[in-house]
Amino acid sequence: EQMAYVGATPWHGLGNNLPRKQPIEIWQREAGMDWQILESPVHFKFDAVGHLGAIHSYPEQKVLYRSDTKAPLSVVSNRYHTVQPREVLEFYRDLTEVSGYELETAGVLKGGRKFWALARTGQGTAIKGNDQVNGYLLLATSCDGTLATTATPTTVRVVCNNTLTIALDGSSRAIKVPHNTRFDPQAVKKQLGIAVSQWDDFMYRMRHLAERKVQWHEAMGFFMNVMCEVSPTGQLPEQLPNERALRKVQELYEGRGRGSQLESARGTA
């Protein structure tokens, strides 16, 4: 069992404590989720004598195992769709980058047969004094058939198998995706009413572009690549293709274009 968390130490005192707002890649490593679920056909021996015998396969079933330790996880139907540990964390990428969610806990249970991630939604309230109740979004799944891929709002801070069970039990708003169906993160978010809108995504990209400073040689190199199909770091021809258009675009970018002198546009991407 392995997990990572931010904030208060779990009751069991285990896990890796992380600073707030760490990237998905850090969570993946510290929560013990930096491995994949691989699969192999089921094989069995026939007419075995000692260690020798004919090996046959059973095409209706497959073995799931860990890519890092090669430890077996389960035997499932060949129609079983696995959800990878990284997919559980990636579910939160746009929510944390655009919608203000913050990952709170994540980890693996039962040797990797079950894993989860939990993010704080930013909603919460204080009940009678200092009793703070926070809103979370939980995504949990298994690879042994014991748990469908389940996304649900909860007020339970999941840090172990017991708290995971409590969070999943009795949730009327849970979205469950059985393993005979492919997990579609965006469809689940839409069902929960938390999908990042096109406008939110656009604003997120615009803010990042406005913060990205661009030097003159970078801009010229980009324009030459796109308009002249010439690498600025290579040998330049005597006459640039589309040179007139290149100069026009350069002038627009450097101040003659409408809006190019705005603080969010001048010298940025």
Question: Residue ranges of each PLM-predicted region?
Answer:
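Short, well-ordered loop/turn elements at secondary-structure boundaries
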Residues: 59, 112-113, 133-134
